[in-house]
Each structure stands twice: as C-alpha cells, then as structure tokens.
Amino acid sequence: ATFVRKEHINVTNETFKKPAIIIANHQSFIDILELLSFSPKIIMITNHWVWNSPVFGKIIQYAGFFHVDEGYELCVERMRKKVREGYSIAIFPEGTRTYDGKMKRFHKGAFYLSETLQLDIIPILLYGNGEIIAKAQPFYVRKGIIYSKILPRILYNDDSFGTTYQERTKRISSYMKEEYARICLEKNTPANPAFYEALVLNYIYKSPVIEWYIRIKVKMEH
C-alpha cells in the first residue's frame, strides 16, 4: 500500500548464506512474512496459533516448519538436517506477539538451539509492524512505517554475551532491547504517520479546537 513506507537496514550486509539462528521481536503476523523475505533458506519455529491458523497453518506445515509444542529436544535432529541443507532457523524468542509494542521477556529456546547446533545468532529488530497491523485488529491496516534492522551476527562461541545459553538469553535480550529503544527514539516522531495519528488521537475527544491546533502545530514543525 502507498501509505506504508518500508525501510531496511542491514548493518553488515548479511546474506544468510551461512546457516544461523535468527531471532526477532514480535509485533504482528506480518513479522513472519518479513523474516521469510530475507532469504529462501529460512524455516521457522512457530507457536500453536500460527500452526493452527486457517490462513498460514497448512502452508507452514507443508513448508516443513517446526512447532514449538513439539519441544526443542525432540526437534533437534530434524533441525540439524535442515541446517546441513543450508537453512537458517527463525524464532521469536518472546513467544507471542506484543500488544503494546514493548519487547517482552525472552524464552531460552533459541539460545539453547544455538548452543546445541553450534549456530551463530542473527538478531533482527522489527519496528512499526504492530502499528500497521495490530494484534488486537489483525484485519485493519493503518498508515505507518515497516522498519527492519539486521544487527551483526553473534558467533556461537562469542563469550562476550555469556558462556551458557541461559546467560546469553539475558544478555542478548538486553542488547536487543537497548537497540530497539534507540530505533523508537528515532522513529517515534510526527514524521511517522502511525505516531502522528496516535498523537492526534490523544487529543481528539478533548476539544475540536485542541485537535485542530495539534494537527496544525505538528505539521508546521515537521
């Protein structure tokens, strides 16, 4: 759609040719489509909602994706086979989509797999998807920005983020949240249509004069 602007940053020109564990924050069902667009050699670990979805379910099952309820330990050998075929494995470590855009606690599964399969981790930050298609209104498309940032690979044996998968879960989570906060500072401005509409909406029921003033003021300053 013309009212959705797309921005993509690839910090180190990642090609995904070397298999890795891809982790990303999760805001909207379009996150899945965005991650899969980065390479044809990406498969995902999905939750029960996606696995049983009338829209995505049959497609992802046919594509050989993995279901988190199977348990990581039971899937490891099948995943190892896909890795040998050149596939990266994408996971949303938060487990489910966020309602408010804030990143939630990370589960340990992705980091367990990185350690077990000896795969690097590629962190990806997604911004704006939850504003364009929110979890609460999955069929309503708003104006906004679809922004993605591929951060540098974290080597599986890089101990600067910890030496165990438990430590790496906490430290990489903190690292991604800090980077995401920087993106929000940059993008949460009236130049972003989604942020502009949210700002105006905050005043819309207070007074038509205040709403008019805010709209004019914001447009003059940006």
Task: For every predicted segment, state its role.
Residues 1-9, 55-59, 202, 208, ...:
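A transmembrane-helix-recognition feature enriched in membrane-embedded lipid enzymes
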Residues 7, 41-42, 66, 86, ...:
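Secondary-structure boundary/capping positions in well-ordered alpha/beta enzyme cores
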Residues 8-9, 66-70, 156:
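Short acidic-hydrophobic, aromatic-tinged amphipathic segments that line or gate anion-handling sites
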Residues 10-15:
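Glycine-rich helix-loop-beta junction characteristic of Rossmann-like nucleotide cofactor-binding loops
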Residues 75-222:
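Non-catalytic C-terminal accessory region of glycerolipid acyltransferases
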